[in-house]
Amino acid sequence: FQTTMTDFWTAIQELSKDPSSSVTQGMLVQRAAEFVQRAGAVYSGLSSYQNNLNTQIKQNVDKINKYGNQLLTLNDQIRAIESGGIEHANDLRDARNQILDELAELTNMTFSEDRYGSVSVQIEGVDFVKDGTCYEIALKTDEATGFYTPFWPQNATYTVRADGTRDYNIDGAEVFDLSVEISSDLNTDIGGLKAMLLARGDHRANYTDLAEGKYDSVSQSVVMNIQGEFDQMIHNVVTKVNDILAKAAGVQTGDLELADGTKLENARYCTVDPDGYMRMEDGSPIQLFTKVTTDGYEKVSVKEADGSLKDYWVMKKEDPDSPESLYTIGNLQVNPALTKEPSKLGFRLADGSEDKETADALKAAFTEEAYTLNPNVQKKTTFVDYYTDLVSQVSNSGYVFRSIYENQVTTVEATQSAREQVIGVSTDEELSNMIKFQNAYNASSRYINVISEMLDHILSTLGV
């Protein structure tokens, strides 16, 4: 993508040298199309990674439920063998301990054993295996994304659909509370399943998730954080380019009163002028980047000071609650009219002169240090350097996470080694015991042989 970004920047630089050239205009439109296409490919790759994590989440939940039912079976078998107080079901206990170890890798779990030899298990403080019952974890599927959310059915409410299936309301019944701070001090960083949920996130993020007050909802998700920052870069480039072209087309900001009395505050608007500079055939301002689902401008009738009505083009505002109104990666395309005829840009004013001012403004926009990766970053960057900073941030975060992972692996291995010293089997120790017992057997055997010979001699002598 860095190459695509550089090519787009180069096309803008070439345009500033000769704005009215059909060659430089065509190159600008072509590079803009590549920019949108490659941005979509990068975002699609991030979404695919989310889907992969989502699949792993389901597989791990299925595995946890399988372990729960296996524990019930082992509890019954161990209890049956040890109920007489004579035998010990060591092999079965080893198998059960192995399952508990596997559960501990996936979740924050605790367990206890009763006097009959049965274990009870809690996951995130909620009963999972208890009193001969396994309370299986269920999955709620998000209709928009297909993302799974693990929840406890026994703690959820539900309604029955017409087809007889249950529609669960899982508020308060989620297995994991992902809103809490992730910290070793708080013991909230335990379990592979929770880590996958955090990494995946709960939706496909875009630039609106980086707004003040919303960033905390995506900051803990590696994938969503990258999605939001990347989409923000694309949004900033697209809207900045369109804004510069809008200014050239005569778009201004002010308050308007529509024919029906509706008042628009701080609206961006212009008159309907099919013959105007940087205008389409319908008189609306030219946009290099347009939305797929909705138009960028809306024609309205405005009440003039003398009471007459006049048509204007008003730029539609973006609404975070209305995805189709946003200039986001999944809703972007290069203006189809410019794709067919790039020379519509013109860059030639009414007097026949080249519009160097607009071309230079496009060039200056790419070197303006006015953008940050997210609300927690203070460093201002340019369009040219934004993607480099984004990649560097991901790289640095990955290095930190890898260091943490390696430290945790070392800790786990040390703990496991200490554990094996207590409950494990040492081959050297077992071999030493075998030799000791063999020597003891041989010594005992020789002793018995001597006694046997002595008795035989006495009996034989007395018998004579």
Predicted regions located by residue number:
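Structural signature of extracellular appendage/secretion-system components
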Residues: 1-464
